[in-house]
């Protein structure tokens, strides 16, 4: 009896993560609900408008990024500590809510399904739908390019939106998870190599590269493992580093290996063509079956990572 009570106590340490994770799997990101990332975005926007001018833009942007990331970590840690003074259950509930808001597994799957359904109706509908989840110019994309963009984004955001947040939760708890989301939001807003953000956002972009270095490679390994394709790791090692990003190429190359297809090529960003190396060699037409395989791979990789995080939480505590 004591053994099972003892085990249940330590299992309870993983419950906030499990609760938040299951909530994301069930609810996704309901429209109209308040979201901390919206607050992150407002803080970044205010800082950028105030500081991105004059001299020393790289320094000012770097200081802003570091303050926002460290501030997010410390604020989250303090909120949980104060909640724990009232009752540990209050802290656990807040932690579970935080995990829910930091994960984006179901939402992205929903968006990718919507892209494939839209492009089956018309190319124009597909362009509009894929424009919701990619940064490239979608106005001239072909149906093939629309489907490819959706699949590439699904693979990349499995790392950014699911595996990486879970990784940082396992390492540093909810404060680490929230700090990662701030890093990711900074990169998505000011981490571009255009005239406006080239200097100001360079530290934010480097922070994102560092924060995703291990998670991106772990994501690729998980994708291959759950799909029974670990023998294709050499493919990932070959094409993963070819991507302009030091991280995005790994989950994308894993999916290309699984689907035996080719990603990459030239796309327009902010009115300028950007040439991306090809990932894979088999240029073929994408189908709904590819989307279903990719979604199944994502879901299984997320499940595997979630179980790993639960195990780590129990062992550590």
Predicted regions and their residues:
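Hydrophobic alpha-helical transmembrane segments
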Residues: 1-178, 191-317
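Pseudouridine synthase
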Residues: 181
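Substrate/ligand-engaging "lid" and interaction regions
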Residues: 184
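Glycine-rich phosphate/dinucleotide-binding loop and adjoining beta-alpha-beta core of small-molecule
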Residues: 188
């Amino acid at each position: 009896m004591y053994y099972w009570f003892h085990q249940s106590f330590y299992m309870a340490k993983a419950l906030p993560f499990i609760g938040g994770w299951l909530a994301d799997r069930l609810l996704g990101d309901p429209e109209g609900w308040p979201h901390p990332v919206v607050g992150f975005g407002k803080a970044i926007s205010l800082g950028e408008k105030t500081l991105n001018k004059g001299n020393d833009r790289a320094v000012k942007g770097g200081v802003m990024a570091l303050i926002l990331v460290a501030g997010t970590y410390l604020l989250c840690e303090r909120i949980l500590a104060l909640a724990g003074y009232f009752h540990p259950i209050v802290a656990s509930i807040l932690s579970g809510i935080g995990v829910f808001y930091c994960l984006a597994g179901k939402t992205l799957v929903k968006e990718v399904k919507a892209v494939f359904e839209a492009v089956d109706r018309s190319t124009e509908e597909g362009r509009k739908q894929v424009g919701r989840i990619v940064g490239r110019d979608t106005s001239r994309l072909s149906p093939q390019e629309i489907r490819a963009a959706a699949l590439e984004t699904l693979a990349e955001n499995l790392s950014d939106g699911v595996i990486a947040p879970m990784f940082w939760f396992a390492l540093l708890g909810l404060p680490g998870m929230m700090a990662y989301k701030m890093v990711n939001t900074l990169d998505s807003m000011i981490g571009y190599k255009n005239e406006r953000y080239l200097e100001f956002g360079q530290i934010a972009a480097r922070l994102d590269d560092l924060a995703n270095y291990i998670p991106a490679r772990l994501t690729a390994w998980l994708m291959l493992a759950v799909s029974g394709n670990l023998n294709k790791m050499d493919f990932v090692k070959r094409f993963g580093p070819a991507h302009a990003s030091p991280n995005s190429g790994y989950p994308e190359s894993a999916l290309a290996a699984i689907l035996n297809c080719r990603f990459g090529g030239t796309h327009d960003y902010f009115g300028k063509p950007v040439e991306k190396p090809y990932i894979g060699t088999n240029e073929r037409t994408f189908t709904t079956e590819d989307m279903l395989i990719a979604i199944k791979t994502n879901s299984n990789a997320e499940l595997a990572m979630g179980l790993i995080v639960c195990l780590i939480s129990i062992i550590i505590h």
